[in-house]
Amino acid sequence: MSGKFLIFGATGSIGSSLAEQMNNAGYDNVHLVSRNQDEVEAIASKYGFSFTVADVLEQGYTEKIKVDLEDALGIAYCIGSIDLKPFKMVTENDFNKCMKLNLYSAIEAIKAYQEALKKNKGSVVLFSTAAVHRGFTNHSIIASAKAAVEGLAISLAAEFAPNIRVNCIAPSLTNSKIAQPMLKNTAIAEGIAKAHPLKRIGEGKDSASLAKFLLTNESSWITGQVIAVDGGRSKLA
């Protein structure tokens, strides 16, 4: 089989952890996508993976990726953002940019490889957030965008069955570059950790281990699910 597993956001906390776990599990057919050339090149070189430098916010970005990879076994769209503002300060552009990053570009990726995924009975893994299921102040932008991602995942799971599985992971706050503005403050970080029943901040590997399971045939009888990886935050806190 010539196809590969695509990891979008491969230099982020979850994406890079997923690349590591796929390598550790013996998968060498992985293609990484990131806008950060030096970082993605280093990760790809470390594991012997192929890669494309591409920015998902650019028009027609999938064409650049398809030059490097035509055939896909699965897609993990490990891209997210933390857009926090009081609602009275939120602009239409804030919503548009967040929707483009989290929803529209994921749609473009799936459409670009839909036929390959169908042929290979592949899998799509999308990412949401715990903020969709538990109200947090200042989260209207990202919660709205990720709620749309969940709707997309469930709808496509129904439409694509039985040939393509589609699932969604909903993490709580994860230790990552985009979370550092909050986590660099020790008191804030400790407060956030205590708000979770499991009393810690998530790590990239927490969501990545589930992503690996959902991306591969280990989860061949699972589709249309939104699964929380949130230390119990959405249900128990």
Protein language model regions, located:
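N-terminal Rossmann NAD(P)H-binding glycine-rich loop of SDR-like oxidoreductase domains
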Residues: T11, A19
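Substrate-binding pocket helix/loop in short-chain dehydrogenase/reductase
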Residues: P86-F87, T91-M99, A189-I192
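Alpha-helical segment proximal to the catalytic Tyr-Lys
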Residues: E115, A157-P162, S220
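Catalytic loop of short-chain dehydrogenase/reductase
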Residues: S123-A148, A153-A161, L173-T174
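Short C-terminal tail/terminal secondary-structure segment
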Residues: R134, K212, T223-A237
